[in-house]
């Protein structure tokens, strides 16, 4: 993307200069300077700081497309007031081709958490006591970006403490749905009785993973839609569900026993990074069929056909909504929130990141940074974000750099 911009700027300057006639042949070169809508997949800049909390999150799907879908659904209800829902998972059935994907995501999530819990003993993690800043390295950095209480009196300097695995990877929680088809919403009075679990785990359960602790109803026949209301005429059968829970739990336990081997830090870091990529890829596939909702103003998330009705939003304009969330379509960053940290190029050096050189430092997701410091190779898609091609100037050379 940068090369394209440089070529465009250079040709524009040449054409506008007084020497354009003498070098007309240069501008007529067969150079493809067309700007594609799709950005270079290998180029990813350092993520920008979060926007103002008063602004709503952008819609992944354009509003015109959402209105068109709503009109089609309304017209279909008028034409067929009573109909059988045919497309899973809206009809209460599982998507057959995504059952294995759900098991893979669940397995990769367990391997990711297990690997990070072992790597954290070798790669220190630091967390600011007053804000959400996370740093991976022997010592906390000196970059003044703290926004917590009293940050003005400390010149925005962070106050570091020892971090945990939950600071490295963020799995937001949502309400667990026993029956996503007939009862897709949790009301306000049920907020203390319905358990909340990780959104990734809830997505796997709704896609076919059976867990004894969090049961879910499985159907063999689709449900009916009568004037927009979901009705189920199938008899409840608990026998098959119990067998599925027992077999799935047994397979997971056997898989964990087989993989309990002593591995080096480099091998463990590489496998943990692979588990992260496989989990994110699987979650993307599941989100194409299973709906996930997020609030447009706060981090609340819900997996299911609709968002819940619990009135606990405290973000912008929540008084106008009576505490209800402004639900919209979620993205992968809402389900698996990457915590971006500053990249430490040489962890064994012992030097601390300086605030005056922060524009030369790169960033990366905390999981990637932790695995890279553990010995795993840097993924190609994070080379530019980590700014590996940038040479750090010395502290006394900062004023000499343009």
UniProtKB/Swiss-Prot annotation:
The keyword Transit peptide applies. Residues 1-13 form a transit peptide. Residues 37-59 are annotated as: Disordered. It comes from the Eukaryota. It is found in: Mitochondrion. Residues 48-58 have a biased composition (Basic and acidic residues). Keywords: Mitochondrion, Repeat, Transit peptide. InterPro entries: APO_dom. Pfam families: APO_RNA-bind (PF05634). The APO repeats may provide ligands for 4Fe-4S centers. May be involved in the stable assembly of several 4Fe-4S cluster-containing complexes of mitochondria. This is APO protein 3, mitochondrial. It comes from Arabidopsis thaliana.
């Amino acid at each position: 993307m940068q090369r394209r911009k440089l070529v465009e700027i250079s040709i524009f300057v040449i054409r506008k200069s007084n020497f354009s006639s003498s070098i007309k042949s240069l501008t007529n070169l067969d150079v493809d300077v067309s700007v594609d809508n799709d950005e270079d997949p290998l180029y990813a800049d350092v993520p920008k700081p979060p926007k103002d909390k008063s602004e709503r999150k952008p819609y992944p799907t354009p509003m015109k497309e959402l209105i068109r879908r709503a009109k089609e659904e309304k017209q279909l209800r008028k034409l067929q007031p009573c109909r059988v829902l045919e497309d899973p998972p809206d009809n209460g059935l599982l998507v057959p081709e995504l059952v294995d994907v759900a098991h893979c995501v669940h397995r990769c999530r367990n391997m990711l958490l297990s690997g990070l819990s072992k790597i954290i003993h070798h790669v220190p993690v630091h967390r600011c006591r007053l804000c959400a800043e996370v740093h991976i390295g022997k010592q906390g950095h000196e970059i003044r970006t703290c926004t917590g209480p009293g940050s003005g009196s400390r010149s925005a300097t962070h106050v570091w403490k020892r971090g945990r695995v939950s600071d490295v990877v963020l799995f937001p929680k949502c309400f667990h749905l026993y029956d996503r088809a007939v009862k897709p919403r949790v009301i306000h009075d049920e907020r203390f009785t319905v358990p909340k679990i990780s959104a990734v785990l809830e997505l796997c359960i709704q896609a076919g993973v059976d867990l004894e602790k969090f049961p879910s109803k499985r159907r063999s026949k689709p449900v009916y839609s009568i004037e927009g209301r979901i009705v189920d005429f199938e008899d409840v059968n608990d026998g098959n569900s119990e067998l599925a829970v027992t077999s799935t739990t047994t397979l997971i336990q056997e898989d964990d026993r087989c993989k309990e081997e002593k591995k080096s830090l480099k091998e463990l870091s590489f496998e943990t990074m692979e588990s992260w990529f496989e989990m994110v890829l699987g979650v993307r596939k599941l989100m194409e069929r299973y709906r996930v909702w997020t609030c447009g103003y706060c981090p609340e998330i819900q997996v299911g056909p609709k968002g819940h009705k619990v009135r606990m939003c405290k973000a912008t304009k929540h008084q106008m909504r009576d505490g209800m969330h402004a639900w919209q379509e979620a993205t992968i960053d809402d389900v698996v929130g990457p915590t971006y940290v500053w990249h430490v190029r040489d962890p064994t050096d012992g030097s601390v990141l300086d605030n005056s050189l922060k524009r030369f430092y790169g960033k990366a997701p905390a999981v990637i940074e932790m695995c890279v410091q553990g010995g795993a190779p840097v993924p190609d898609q994070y080379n530019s974000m980590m700014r590996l091609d940038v040479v750090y100037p010395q502290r006394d050379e900062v004023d000499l750099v343009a």
